[in-house]
C-alpha cells in the first residue's frame, strides 16, 4: 500500500493519497469570501520543504483568477507579519512563527492578519481562538489502511480535503 502525494503511475497498487493540487485550489475557492477581508495571500514555502511543488502553481492560479495579490515566501526565518495579509502555513512550526511574530508586531490573528494551516491538529482549535485549516480526515486514512492490511481489501483512493473554519480568517 502506498500512502503518498499521488503524482505517479500507480494503477497496479493500492493507495490512499492526499491531493495537494486541485483539492487545494477548491478549498481556497470555498474560503474565497473569508479571504476577501485581506488583499494579499502569502504561501509560506521554504526551499527545502517536503511538500509538492505543484501547490505553488495552484496557489498562484487561485490568486490570479480571484484578484488577490500573492507572494510565495521562501525565507520563513526572517518573516515579518503584516496587516492585511493571509499567511498559508504548511508546517506547524510556521503556524507558531506567524502567531508569535504577529503578537510582536502588535497584530491580532483573524482581525489584522489571517492564518490558514495545512493538516489540522488538535491545538489549532485553541491557538488564538482557533486556526483555520485544510486537512484530510486522518482517522479515515488510518481506517482505510487498516482495512487493507487486515482484510487485504484493495483500495485506490484520494481522500477529500476538508476546510475547518475557525477565527483566524
Predicted ranges, named:
Residues 5, 44-49, 88-93, 119:
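Structural motif
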Residues 6-42, 95, 134-154:
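Hydrophobic alpha-helical segments within soluble ligand-binding/sensing domains
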Residues 9-10, 49-55, 94, 123:
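Short, charged/polar "capping" segments at the starts of alpha-helices
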Residues 22-66, 157-169:
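An alpha-beta-alpha
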Residues 34-37, 78-84:
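Flexible, charged surface loops at secondary-structure boundaries
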Residues 63-69, 104-109:
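Short helix-capping segments at alpha-helix termini
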Residues 65-80:
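A short, well-structured beta->alpha microelement
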Residues 81-86, 93-169:
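Flexible loop/turn connectors
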Amino acid at each position: 500500500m502506498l500512502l503518498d502525494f499521488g503524482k505517479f503511475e500507480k494503477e497496479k497498487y493500492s493507495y490512499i493519497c492526499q491531493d495537494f493540487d486541485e483539492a487545494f485550489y477548491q478549498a481556497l475557492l470555498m474560503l474565497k469570501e473569508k479571504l476577501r477581508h485581506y488583499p494579499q495571500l502569502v504561501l509560506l514555502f521554504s526551499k527545502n520543504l517536503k511538500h509538492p511543488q505543484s501547490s505553488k502553481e495552484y496557489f498562484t492560479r487561485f490568486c490570479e483568477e480571484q484578484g488577490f495579490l500573492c507572494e510565495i515566501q521562501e525565507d520563513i526565518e526572517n518573516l515579518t507579519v503584516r496587516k492585511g495579509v493571509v499567511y498559508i502555513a504548511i508546517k506547524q512550526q510556521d503556524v507558531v512563527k506567524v502567531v508569535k511574530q504577529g503578537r510582536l508586531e502588535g497584530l491580532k490573528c483573524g482581525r489584522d492578519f489571517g492564518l490558514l494551516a495545512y493538516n489540522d491538529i488538535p491545538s489549532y482549535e485553541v491557538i488564538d481562538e482557533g486556526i483555520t485549516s485544510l486537512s484530510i480526515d486522518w482517522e479515515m486514512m488510518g481506517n482505510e489502511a487498516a482495512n487493507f492490511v487486515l482484510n487485504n481489501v484493495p483500495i485506490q483512493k484520494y481522500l477529500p480535503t476538508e476546510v475547518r473554519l475557525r477565527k483566524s480568517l
